[in-house]
Amino acid sequence: MAKQTPLYQQHLADGAKMVDFHGWMMPLHYGSQLDEHHIVRREAGIFDVSHMTIVDLHGARTREFLRYLLANDVAKLTQPGKALYTGMLNASGGVIDDLIVYFLTEDYFRLVVNSATREKDLAWIEQHAAPFGIEIREREDLALVAVQGPQAQEKVQAILKAKGLSDADVAAVASMKPFFGKQAGDFFVATTGYTGEAGYEIALPNEQVVDFWQQLLAAGVKPCGLGARDTLRLEAGMNLYGQDMDEGISPLAANMGWTIAWQPEDRQFIGREALTHQREKGTDQLVGLVLTEKGVLRNDLPVRFTDSDGVMREGVITSGSFSPTLGVSIALARVPLGIGEQAIVQIRNRELPVHVTKPGFVRAGKAIVQY
């Protein structure tokens, strides 16, 4: 039996088309995935992401533990509320999951991990936390919603004020830079997201989330489903775990090299030795593709190119879709080193030319890629 978030009945009332997503009944769309995509780029949309897993870590050695567990370095987190995006790797350098870690106090950090990887993530964390004396608490008492788009922050701030939060709390939320989180009353508000737009991700008690959702709808924020969430994150060049990377893929081959903290050299983290060998040897790379001809780039399609030695090389599309913002088809693809600015994708029996770009296409509603 698939699990339901606290917003399940609300989704039905809002007219959602529900689907089973990794064991959770989640809204795919509320009538038009295309309209939902555009509303986030132009105004504001709200997503139920309560299927995500929030894990709180407590203990005097929590920072030390996370410096060992994660490829990015939580030593960078010196200001309370500051967050990092990172991979959690296995010994061979594969990605067990990608996650966000928040520094709250010296003995209290928060992780937000993917729903599809919940059980293995918790088992991995528990296995490695034991020697550090860490208390692990999964926050099943909290729901999680994402309000995203150019009007999102203004709308959320108005509702927080209407809910009786102090002027100081609302001002502190309004002044947060990207990748910060703050506890404001019952709400943990973070300037994070998965769309390439400004906005908040808000954790709040399960029993309060329906009322909060309804207040956002009344303020003109539109409900959005997993379909729009996927096209928005693809336009933003953000990875989806299980497609763009997994336990058999190095972060170096998934456009996650920037999330590996190589310095200081004496920090030993899980996967470091394997990553060092991979970096020396060279790995595949994740690139962007743009198809301006008629057709849609889909997952698993082959990508071919001729390298500088005249050798035909082949990669594969990891995530592909039509881009509503750009009006063309886009994709992320893992390819061997040596690709130029052009490649060929085979769609059924047609070989179509594609432009090779950096893996990111849209930010803040504007194209950031040339093709």
Curated annotation (Swiss-Prot):
Query: Would you say which domain of life the source belongs to?
Result: Bacteria
> What top-tier enzyme class does this entry carry?
transferase
**One Pfam family named in its UniProt record:** GCV_T_C
Annotated transmembrane regions: none
Q: Does the keyword Transferase apply?
A: yes
Does the record bear NAD in its keywords?
no
Record field: catalytic activity: N(6)-[(R)-S(8)-aminomethyldihydrolipoyl]-L-lysyl-[protein] + (6S)-5,6,7,8-tetrahydrofolate = N(6)-[(R)-dihydrolipoyl]-L-lysyl-[protein] + (6R)-5,10-methylene-5,6,7,8-tetrahydrofolate + NH4(+)
Q: Which UniProt keywords apply?
A: Aminotransferase, Transferase
Instruction: Enumerate the Gene Ontology biological process terms.
Output: glycine decarboxylation via glycine cleavage system
Q: What is its EC number?
A: 2.1.2.10
Where is it found, in Gene Ontology cellular component terms? cytosol; glycine cleavage complex
- GO molecular function list: aminomethyltransferase activity; transaminase activity
Quaternary state and interactors: The glycine cleavage system is composed of four proteins: P, T, L and H.
Q: What does this protein do?
A: The glycine cleavage system catalyzes the degradation of glycine.
> Which HAMAP family is this protein grouped with?
GcvT (MF_00259)
Q: NCBIfam families from the xrefs?
A: gcvT (TIGR00528), PRK00389.1 (NF001567)
Similarity comment: family membership: Belongs to the GcvT family.
Q: What is this protein called?
A: Aminomethyltransferase
Source organism per UniProt: Pectobacterium carotovorum subsp. carotovorum (strain PC1)
